[in-house]
Amino acid sequence: NVWKVGSGDCFVAHFAHGWMHDGLAPADAARAASFAAAFYCAKQRLPTRDDLASCTFPPIAVSQNYASGQRPQVYLAGPFFDLAQVWMVEQARATLKALGLRVFSPYHDIGLGSADDVVEKDLQGIRDSDMLFAIADGLDAGTIYEIGYARAIGKPVVVYSERLTEENLKMMQGSGCIICTNYTTAMYSALWEAAKL
């Protein structure tokens, strides 16, 4: 889980302590402060010196393509049948774009229509995308199908669900989807997954 509220405060406090109190060079103080902020985001508490000495985090893998500026396209799957669902799709699209990713959203890029009008375009959108981000709350049949289709053709999938049970998510968990139960973690997970591509 990623808990980012207060992470900036944690970074600043540890940076100042490392630089002004411990006499670290600014780059070293920033490195130590980044680690402290990562601990805070993951554990939802301020780290002690013992915490920082004994805790390790795996590095985020970044592909050569991503490092050279290429940005993967994310297919945004999710229901859009009422105001709350449309708002969530809008919010997810805006956040993914703010993270620097390209987004294909059936709601925005295809629109509403009959099965004959939209299904093949949706599937082509999945094929043309590098990964899929799914808003799964509500167990929308179309979203579930898109998740399965993406996994069947080898696309990474990040599933965001705050209300579904483990039983509801069993097939997604078992097929290698990354399951996230809060919005912030889901967004960062999508970014970290995209950075690998």
Language-model segment annotations:
Residues 175-190:
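Short acidic-hydrophobic, aromatic-tinged amphipathic segments that line or gate anion-handling sites
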Residues 138-159:
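Amphipathic helical hotspot of TIR/SEFIR-family domains
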Residues 100, 128-130, 175-176:
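Short, well-ordered alpha-helix to beta-strand connector turns
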Residues 1-69:
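Conserved phosphate-binding/catalytic region of the ribokinase-like
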Residues 132-133, 157, 178-179:
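Short, well-ordered beta-strand core segments
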Residues 111-134, 142-146:
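TIR-domain catalytic/interaction hotspot
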Residues 162-174:
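Short, glycine/polar-rich helix-capping loops at beta-to-alpha or helix-loop-helix junctions
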Residues 38-84, 88, 92-97, 106-111:
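Charged C-terminal helix
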